[in-house]
Amino acid sequence: MEKYKELLTGLEEISKKHDIVIHTETQIENGQTTINTQALCISADEKTNTDLLISDIQELISRIKNFTIKVTILQYNNDKLDIFKYPFED
C-alpha cells in the first residue's frame, strides 16, 4: 500500500509540473491494491513536452520498482492525431 501511495503522490506531482490531468483506476482484490494500468489516462495538449513527461513517469516508476506500466500518448500534430506508444518495464 505504501508503494501505491508513493505512485499516486508522484503522479500528482507530475500532473502539476506538466499542467495535465492524470486519471487512475484502482482495484482492491483479496486485500491487495492494484492499479488498473489500462485506466492510467493522461490528458494533455500540444504544448505538453511528451518526451519530458514520459521521462518523469519512467523516473517515478524506476524509484518504486513494483509496477509495469505501458503509456500511450495521444498528441495532436497539424490537426492529425498521432499515437505514440512508450512501453517500458521496470
Predicted segments with their positions:
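N-terminal acidic leader/helix
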Residues: 2-23, 29
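Detector for the mature cores of small, proteolytically processed
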Residues: 27-90
